[in-house]
Amino acid sequence: METYILSLDQGTTSSRAILFNKKGEIVHSAQKEFTQYFPKPGWVEHNAQEIWGSILAVIATCLSEADVKPEQIAGIGITNQRETAVVWEKATGKPVYNAIVWQSRQTAEICEELKEKGYGDMVREKTGLLIDAYFSGTKVKWILDNVEGAREKAERGELLFGTIDTWLVWKLSGGKAHVTDYSNASRTLMFNIHDLKWDDELLEILTVPKSMLPEVRPSSEVYGHTVDYHFFSQNVPIAGVAGDQQAALFGQACFSEGMAKNTYGTGCFMLMNTGETAVNSNHGLLTTIAWGLNGKVNYALEGSIFVAGSAIQWLRDGMRMVNDASESEEYASRVESTDGVYVVPAFVGLGTPYWDSEVRGAVFGVTRGTTKEHFIRATLESLGYQTRDVLCAMEADSGIELKTLRVDGGAVKNNFLMQFQSDMLQVPVERPMISETTALGAAYLAGLAVGYWESQEEIKAQWDMDRSFTPEMEKERSEELYSGWKKAIEATKAFK
């Protein structure tokens, strides 16, 4: 009887179940979207029960459509939208409030207060993160402060907190396992990434009782088993957990120090494996835990670009320049260059290395000769420039020179963008055969824990390249274009 690993990929807009075989190939997948709630401007929430329902639905659909029996599942891996916070009652399993999503800015005031009190350096030192509404800690504080009776219940030990991975493991195990992994814990603002413990000083600042917090475990081990009534009478090991970006790094087999991947989704997330060293950043990067495996912890540097794929959506929906995102490649290729046009897509501010949330988008160098093609090309090129900004920060912080960049996410299908990316970085850009690297990473972590795959060496050998893009542009020309981008950034920041 052939066995499989089931990967549950719980994202920001949808939940997916993907079956992988021993070769790391996708056998079948199912997807279900769920509701986004925007109670006030800048707030984003999800219904945690609806997310749980969507997970049960995609598991059932995936197995039945693939004609795979529950007993053929050797293990379950979970990867998740990071930072999103859920607080629920231990006794009933009912959330006391909606899940507050990573994008939500509703705790911005709490963050400002913490910064004013001078906690920034201490938080940075312990967690590798910035004080920002993006991370989970202030979201938990907000729920305890704003939901009637929540703080009292928490003090009495009646409430539990978890990021989405924790919530799903708790539900799947019938409330037996309240755990998270190192990669997710490192995004909460409450976890000390050096001594690998929840930090009492941080919890005190955020006024979060320790009794609410899950146990932190490696990213690849058996955390518990599914209860039979949630998994068709089977007790399947839940054996791998990692946050989405770290799972993608693992799925791309970036196991050695200095290897990096960039995911081109709504935004871009670039992670570089820094080995067993937590590299502190002086250039606006986050220091984070990549994964815990075989008794060791691997760290990573992370850069966040807020607008990537969403800039192409803007060309389609806002500017009506293309009918489909895929057309952008064809339009961009019709012209030799942008003819001096730069688009800075700072629609929601700028991420790494600038961290400026006040700045807004701008266009430079427009003349009477500027056409739609120039504009589309300049928008695509902005993704390449922003990635170079992040890479420069990574090389400066780590002292590691990037040899190749592995890429994944929706926009990597765009050959023009991938070629420009290689030209801008002056290193090869490698696109894998399997673009579902996030789900694959979670599957690999689970499979290693249950012996489905023997070792990371076996996984590394499975990584298969679709295409490598190598630099075709002269280095001098690349530098010239990039210095124009830096000027455009400075001018954009000056306009407020």
From Swiss-Prot:
Glycerol binds at residues 82-83, 134, 244-245. InterPro entries: ATPase_NBD, Carb_kinase_FGGY, Carb_kinase_FGGY_CS, FGGY_C, FGGY_N, Glycerol_kin. It is an enzyme of class 2 (transferase). ATP binds at residues 12-14, 266, 309, 313, 410. It catalyses: glycerol + ATP = sn-glycerol 3-phosphate + ADP + H(+). One of its GO terms (molecular function) is glycerol kinase activity. Pathway: Polyol metabolism; glycerol degradation via glycerol kinase pathway; sn-glycerol 3-phosphate from glycerol: step 1/1. Homotetramer and homodimer (in equilibrium). Belongs to the FGGY kinase family. Key enzyme in the regulation of glycerol uptake and metabolism. Catalyzes the phosphorylation of glycerol to yield sn-glycerol 3-phosphate. HAMAP family: Glycerol_kin. This is Glycerol kinase. It comes from Bacillus cytotoxicus (strain DSM 22905 / CIP 110041 / 391-98 / NVH 391-98).
